[in-house]
């Protein structure tokens, strides 16, 4: 606020208004400034607080002013005066018994006389207390609360020596002190703080109004609010309480006297001392809390007193009360609050919508409303309620069509009291959030309706006594009809769904279950007709009663561990039947076909033979259909059979089969051609618990294989006899209901009975499965147990359909309880395959327990698969050939095993190593030990083998590695030891491969110490690199340490040629914070690598920099916007200040600065010489002219300026000394002397203080006194002498200053020279010559140091006070020494700069340019063919190198071009490979299409065959039906005639010619299937070639990728030479892998071809069987022979085709491989050349970089480094050639092994 801060405000007319007046306007405190400030118009009360005018509160209230003591109040009282002594009369009489009257009673001095009056002789009246009374009280009692601002008391006598002012705001009940006044505050009011007050409410004691002067008309003034103290909140309650008063009291506590009353107690003396007060002014105003601008007389106060400040406020802002301290009656919506400036805090009217005229304020309501409204209306009318009468009373509601202020806004509710809540109460108003609708009745829980007059749906019986209104319908909701009321609203009767019953609709009808919300209420039980015992189910769960081991709600599922038997479950195998001389034909099962038989195989039944089946364990008495499974021997074979059922006894008439006649047990059957199952014409009735014998007899058979070849007859093959229950006779099919008829129709339509015809089960229609399950449950009374054999099955559970268990390998049977044909050894692991050798065994079957195969002559073993001991060459076994020195040989190769007598070889035909001789000779061929020098087994045998020389007949030893000599008796070069001693041997010298193995002196022959280490190694084993080298000595890879001198520790790297790095890794010893193998770069977040002392931290500001990194050369951090400086901790460029607070732009005159950046902390501009000023915009001291043309002043200015500056300095020092003397006294520099004198004076005092003073003490005192006087004299003389010396020193100092002025001018000139040199250094600093830069920097540091010393010498000022007389001499010596040193340093700097300039001019780039660009570069760029440094082409790009230039740049460009060319070649090879891959894919696609066409032809033939068979079957069934019809007894002639007519009407859909032609086409198609072999053989060849081409393309692509990587390596020029060797080794490994892949592919091709051949042969065999023109089958032996010959032919054909495919594949693979290999070799040669060139470039680049860092001194060493690298590359090339030769030998060996494998040689 302005008045609190001391800022002047302005009034209405704009005049300056002091803060006192503003405070008066705000707080009614105008008295303090009333005398100084004229009255202003007080603003109205409409915009804020308003206050009444301020005046004297005593006016009109004289009767309310009292005093505790008044003179002459009871009788006249004399008094005297002490002032106006010139007057004759000194004593007077006081008579205050009557009021004062100037004419009648002028001696009355009552307290009412102090009220201000403006009479001309107002000093004639005053108040006076009684004589000598010190404690007097003056008190004003006001009729109301007032604001009190200040008081003024004017005394006629002395002002009181002590007094205090008090106030009361509660009409005198409590008092508080305003201020204490006292001449002696400590004595009168102890503990009260002294004035001035620090805070506006401090109670202090003030002394300035209690002085004894003046003796009359002295004033005491007190202001409540001190204008010098700021007030934070003028509207605070503490300020208001401080100003508010109802009573004011002044306590006078002590009189001022002249002191005579203390010595003379007479009454006359006391008559002079009393209190007399001319005037008392108490300023204030009516206290209205800012709610009134005027006041009226209070009750009982005079109404027309002129100038009276009345006490009753004329309230505004809707307030009332004497002080406006309350709100008006109907304005209680807000809490009462004093008005404030800018806020009236007016009381707000209550909102009662016209329904009330009174209200009250409720603070709780106000707080709950968020301090918005607190008024509560009282006595709401018109049926309203609420705080604002805004609601309707209970049982009334708000009419939405009328305004709330309408008296008829609330209407009575219209609700049925029986069905509504609260006796008919409705919603009083609308509220969408709460769901209230005005006038809406609130019904009971079970009542609805606009008036709540009816029951809710589902309830009935409306009653007023029911708290919920209605009763709930006792109906089950699930069984009740939906969509309406569930019961009658009056009676409660329930409405049930169609399938629901019960009083409450809570039960299902019989045969139904699951009461639910469905449309019908319940669901049918739908129990399975066969799996359930009863059609009724559980009403709650729907569970039907199941037969044994049937589960599911409907009993339609089989329990786990049980199964539903197939219709052919009752099967009896022919192999287990009885008969005379029955021949069992076993049949092997292949993995590629589904068996068409059951059991082991078949029984051959010849004409006239009989087989007997024993039938037991039947499940049910019923009719069973008889099925006979058989297999014809020729395609058109037929047979006639007779089946006789032999019962155990006569059939009882009461049994289920009582209707059976004896002739019914003899049944004739006919086996038709091309059928596999015979269904006998009629079923037989059998009963459980009985044993039946069914005898089957073959009565006749016939057929032919060719029209010209009659059938010779070989019987038929019988598989099994099946008793299939005739399920159609079951009640589920034969019942007369609609469900039974539908089940029968479905069973017949989908031919569900065909499940039991064939052993192989095809998927049935989904409609058959539930019917078969039900029928099976009826026949077998539920499900049957699996009974899986625990040894032969994988699980105890079986297939629920049919009961087939999961068998282990080689195990068959439903229960997995027997070995399959061709397997043996039934046990926990299943059965093992016989695996009889087809070459050595007579049959593929073996004995079922032991697995022994039936061997041919000469074969041996369990599987007849090898020769006997001493023979080989299975199956053509022959004796072993071992020269009598072995008993066994290899069964396949014939190589002898376990040769004796030191022999070896395949036939024991040679001696083993270490022996010699010829064991093939019958005599004298023994193997003898080699004498090298002793034989094997001794400790001195050092040869691998030996032989006898044919010419000299001497034994020649083949020494082991490390030995030499005729008998291997000496150590070879590179080895050491003494083999001549027993146990001695030669050992390889452990030299880590770093010696010449052919050098005899490479190592010591006795100790093995290495003597001639190679490859920069040393040590006793050449196992360490020499000092200055690093690497792995064992790998011959010691390289010279390449350390950057700038980043390397100089103690570990004194020179470039001798740097001690880590011998293993080559890591150089880096300076602090330097990284890199060569110490050539700073660590992250460090910079200044070129300092030679390590790198410095970036120290980037953590928040003002973008990151911790900086420029590695300049150290500049990457700053955020708005920040600058090296570390981003300063303001940005051309700014200054604290970046954390504010940055300001540099305000510098660009004409007067030497750099644009000002001082970053102070903003001072950096002025050029001769310029000064804050902005560098004026001439400096010592310069004249008009800026910017500033010129140095005359030379005399410097002398006079020095004198002036010296005088100014002396003046400042003298001023400082004066301040020190003022603070510390006169001691100063003579403090020690004064302390000495003080000590002696102390001794004198001690002597004087002594009681017993002796003569000696007195003499000692006199002596001390004389000593003191002498010391004082000497000190005075010393001071005089020092003052004279000081004058001399000042004179000499002036002369020295004059000399220093000249020296300063010289220093300025030197600074100018140094700046010029600094500019030259900046120019040289941007060059790339580090050595020159270091020298210049060193010189610059020396120059800087010299400048610093010169400046120190120039500006040093000696102190004349602290130094003695020799200061001048030392100053002259110091200046002389500095001048000589400066001259010497300056001369040295000039000489160094001269040398540096000369050296800089001699530096040439021609050598470097020639090495890099190929030309010296001394010619102009326009004529230079190779360019160079600074040359650019037409496009502005740097030009270096070109055609005919042999520099490093040209060489690198050439290598880059070659690499790109290589990359293009590789890309082209990849494109070609992609083409090959596409052709391979096309070939494979064509092969697959051919195979698909062949398969389609085969499928079509099979389909045609199936159609023919189906037609035949239908024809046979038709004939059989006709026969059955004709044989029936009830057939009448008309029916027979009708059937005959229909039979005759049947027409064949084709003529005999069409049938013949169709048969010919089928035969032709079948014959054409023979070409499938050729087609697929060619196709397989194409596939193999395609796969081989694909593999070749993939290998070529992989190698191309390898070459591409190598090309990228060359292009980058960063890989090592060893990568070439690694790539070559990888190529060799790739070739080996490719060869192995080729071998595996060949094997896979052969396997696939063999499988395809077998499949085609099988297809051809089946086609020949189907062909009508095939030859008839021969006898079994002839058939077996034919099959064997056919197999041999097939094997031979397959072998020939394999050889042909192998030949073609080898030719193609060989050609492709040679092509790829040649291409890879060419690419490898190019890559090796490019790598060698890249290695050369890298070494040259390293040499150039190192030469530049070492001041171009190592250019001579590049040639040596190049030659060394050339030699190393030659070694690597030789190693690579050796690896390539090794690769070729490995490939040859692999090819040889492949050939051997393919030819089986």
UniProtKB/Swiss-Prot annotation:
Disulfide bonds: 286-295, 288-313, 315-324, 327-347, 350-359, 352-377, 380-389, 392-410, 413-426, 415-441, 443-452, 455-470, 473-487, 475-494, 496-505, 508-522, 525-537, 527-544, 546-555, 786-798, 788-805, 807-816, 819-831, 834-846, 836-853, 855-864, 867-877, 880-889, 882-896, 899-908, 911-927, 930-946, 932-957, 959-968, 971-986, 989-1003, 991-1010, 1013-1022, 1025-1038, 1041-1061, 1043-1068, 1070-1079, 1082-1095, 1098-1110, 1100-1117, 1119-1128, 1131-1143, 1146-1158, 1148-1165, 1167-1176, 1179-1190
Main localization of the protein described in the UniProt heading: secreted
Keyword Ligase recorded: no
Pfam families recorded: EGF_laminin, EGF_LMN_ATRN, LAMB1, LAMININ_IV_B, Laminin_N
Residues recorded with modification Phosphoserine: 1535
Localization annotation: Secreted, Extracellular space, Extracellular matrix, Basement membrane
Segments forming domain Laminin N-terminal: 46-285
Entry coiled-coil feature ranges: 1259-1306, 1475-1529, 1576-1793
GO biological process, one term: synapse organization
Glycosylation sites: 251, 371, 1088, 1252, 1311, 1351, 1502
Stretch list, region Domain I: 1446-1801
Residue segments, region Disordered: 1684-1703
Residue ranges of domain Laminin IV type B in the record: 564-780
CDD domains documented for this protein: cc_LAMB2_C (cd22299), EGF_Lam (cd00055)
Assembly: Laminin is a complex glycoprotein, consisting of three different polypeptide chains (alpha, beta, gamma), which are bound to each other by disulfide bonds into a cross-shaped molecule comprising one long and three short arms with globules at each end. Beta-2 is a subunit of laminin-3 (laminin-121 or S-laminin), laminin-4 (laminin-221 or S-merosin), laminin-7 (laminin-321 or KS-laminin), laminin-9 (laminin-421), laminin-11 (laminin-521), laminin-14 (laminin-423) and laminin-15 (laminin-523).
Function of the molecule: Binding to cells via a high affinity receptor, laminin is thought to mediate the attachment, migration and organization of cells into tissues during embryonic development by interacting with other extracellular matrix components.
Record note on domains: The alpha-helical domains I and II are thought to interact with other laminin chains to form a coiled coil structure. Domains VI and IV are globular.
UniProt-recorded name of the protein: Laminin subunit beta-2
Organism: Rattus norvegicus
Gene, per the UniProt record: Lamb2
